[in-house]
Amino acid sequence: MPLAQLADPWQKMAVESPSDSAENGQQIMDEPMGEEEINPQTEEGSIKEIAITHHVKEGHEKADPSQFELLKVLGQGSFGKVFLVKKISGSDARQLYAMKVLKKATLKVRDRVRTKMERDILVEVNHPFIVKLHYAFQTEGKLYLILDFLRGGDLFTRLSKEVMFTEEDVKFYLAELALALDHLHSLGIIYRDLKPENILLDEEGHIKLTDFGLSKESIDHEKKAYSFCGTVEYMAPEVVNRRGHTQSADWWSFGVLMFEMLTGTLPFQGKDRKETMTMILKAKLGMPQFLSPEAQSLLRMLFKRNPANRLGAGPDGVEEIKRHSFFSTIDWNKLYRREIHPPFKPATGRPEDTFYFDPEFTAKTPKDSPGIPPSANAHQLFRGFSFVAITSDDESQAMQTVGVHSIVQQLHRNSIQFTDGYEVKEDIGVGSYSVCKRCIHKATNMEFAVKIIDKSKRDPTEEIEILLRYGQHPNIITLKDVYDDGKYVYVVTELMKGGELLDKILRQKFFSEREASAVLFTITKTVEYLHAQGVVHRDLKPSNILYVDESGNPESIRICDFGFAKQLRAENGLLMTPCYTANFVAPEVLKRQGYDAACDIWSLGVLLYTMLTGYTPFANGPDDTPEEILARIGSGKFSLSGGYWNSVSDTAKDLVSKMLHVDPHQRLTAALVLRHPWIVHWDQLPQYQLNRQDAPHLVKGAMAATYSALNRNQSPVLEPVGRSTLAQRRGIKKITSTAL
């Protein structure tokens, strides 16, 4: 199974002469063809000032730059910057916004018209799935747009990380997008630049359409526009051939986006702009057979080269799309009211955190003095966002840029070596196929852990993929870097300075049931999150549950070592989640997944048993043979009475027995564990000292013997990453934008 797509979406582009750019560039700048929104009499040498009136947030006073504190840079290009700002005065003081700043001196007349148009469109638009403009104002030299700050980054980043989405994910995003486009169309606006980079995610995971620099309000009497603009791969045929286009062009781009999200590739993409345009006009599109009949049908109806025949172009407009069988399960009223839960919720932290924004920008000191970099092109103004590992430490900002770039480059076998950036220290742990060491990042002197995996013994793809997807969870170890030198893979993570959870608990002089409940709640909540995403850990032994610091607080617990973890996949390689699997996953795969999830709960039951009593349920010490241990486990018999159990409550014993049930089908799920009275009513649990066996070394040996017996027959054989269908099919070429 392949590593997630990690190529850098923002490749630096060399400055080209106008003639070269027109011939070779993939990006299409607005070129007047036929009727155009710009007065043909206007020349660059006689630029006229565009009057941008102030816009004030309803119920608030007029704004100016002095009312906003600059916190971070979110994006930067040749014409200006986007800042994360905090309002420091007025009735909305302390509110966070994104502030788009443009220098008038660097804007040509066409760019000024676009900026004015973007401002006017945003003032007019009020929709739950379209970014909101709160203020617009200008100074003598600059233009300012104050917009929603959307913490979740853009859809392009998530697509790059996931490779492709499930059909249920795509259905959700497309449905919200359809409502947003329909609202724009109802106002006479053609969006014209639909692509993942321009679809942002708010903190709940709902979409927000943004960047209206290429949108078109002024159209002729036939309701057609003639500008040749946007990103070529997403252009409709009528835009490419310059015969005039209507709002129907947005529905073609809607189809391109759908195809890309479902397959991980673009439907029409040649080696250069000219070939791509030819494919859009003439190429026959092969429909991937792993797509459902409903998805294939919708794509065929969107990819009609005659715009009049395209779904959504008829008199009913978006209703044609909403009635299509692909969206049959969507409740459109609930969707509009934001009552349907998104498939992905961005990690939450402090309000000003910028986990999903490019550290190339966020690491810069924010100054409201945008310059013109020598190699900047017009379309680079609002470059998007790339995956950044979640972290709550301010000091980690210096580390993030290095981490992201090394992850980006590791698939390309570049010349960068792990030891170029890190100094290797002592061993932390040694396994059968890997060794874990402490390491120090040379540039920042920060400590990390590195897991060095021998690729000849184990394919680390699944482990890295899971950490990339779910490492933003506060109780899952955070991935910082990945290097691949061909023989070994170096997985750099945060350092677990607090040590193993069980070690700390067993050495703790005072430990109560209430404390044990808090620990189990944190771990089980994390496991429930993984299981809901179709991920099973399969090796939840206590040595893989550690503290990130010395505090001992449940919040500092991290689940580590996903070397045996698995993600639920359909037969075609698509990642799935349990609620969407009925039509895509073989029953035996689901059965195995359910068994593995039950094994995770069993492991947590062993941990709970040991926390409460100070000894393990199935092994007496490190000298027990595997046969003896497996026989006890298979019998399902363990003691819950007498001795150390006399100080344990009946509700705790009930939970232990249900988590360690010998029949995996009768074992509690993670969700049911969280609903058990011992977890729910934690504040009513005893706070007195548990009477436990005081022999931590003996317990640790017994625990190691237990999991050694369980894992001794596990020897999975995995083929190299490159042989997987998904890896061969993946090859997304990153698209940049000409939009302001």
Curated annotation (Swiss-Prot):
One of its GO terms (biological process) is positive regulation of transcription by RNA polymerase II. The keyword Lipid metabolism does not apply. Residues 1-26 are annotated as: Disordered. Changing S386E: Loss of interaction with PDPK1 and phosphorylation at S-227. GO terms for molecular function: ATP binding; magnesium ion binding; protein kinase binding; protein serine kinase activity; protein serine/threonine kinase activity. Its EC number is 2.7.11.1. Intestine, thymus, lung, heart and brain. CDD domains: STKc_RSK2_C (cd14176), STKc_RSK_N (cd05582). The keyword Lyase does not apply. The active site is at D193, D539. It is found in: Nucleus; Cytoplasm. Changing S227E: Loss of phosphorylation and activation by PDPK1. Activated by phosphorylation at Ser-227 by PDPK1. Autophosphorylated on Ser-386, as part of the activation process. May be phosphorylated at Thr-365 and Ser-369 by MAPK1/ERK2 and MAPK3/ERK1. Can also be activated via phosphorylation at Ser-386 by MAPKAPK2. Its cofactor is Mg(2+). Gene3D superfamilies: Phosphorylase Kinase, domain 1, Transferase(Phosphotransferase) domain 1. It catalyses: L-seryl-[protein] + ATP = O-phospho-L-seryl-[protein] + ADP + H(+); L-threonyl-[protein] + ATP = O-phospho-L-threonyl-[protein] + ADP + H(+). The modification Phosphothreonine is found at T365. SMART domains: S_TK_X (SM00133), S_TKc (SM00220). One of its GO terms (cellular component) is nucleoplasm. Disruption phenotype: Mice were born at expected Mendelian ratio but display decreased bone mass. Embryos and pups show a delay in mineralization of the skull with frontal, parietal, and interparietal bones of reduced size. Mice also display a significant reduction in long bone length at one month of age. The modification Phosphotyrosine is found at Y529. Forms a complex with either MAPK1/ERK2 or MAPK3/ERK1 in quiescent cells. Transiently dissociates following mitogenic stimulation. Interacts with NFATC4, ETV1/ER81 and FGFR1. Serine/threonine-protein kinase that acts downstream of ERK (MAPK1/ERK2 and MAPK3/ERK1) signaling and mediates mitogenic and stress-induced activation of the transcription factors CREB1, ETV1/ER81 and NR4A1/NUR77, regulates translation through RPS6 and EIF4B phosphorylation, and mediates cellular proliferation, survival, and differentiation by modulating mTOR signaling and repressing pro-apoptotic function of BAD and DAPK1. This is Ribosomal protein S6 kinase alpha-3. The gene is Rps6ka3.
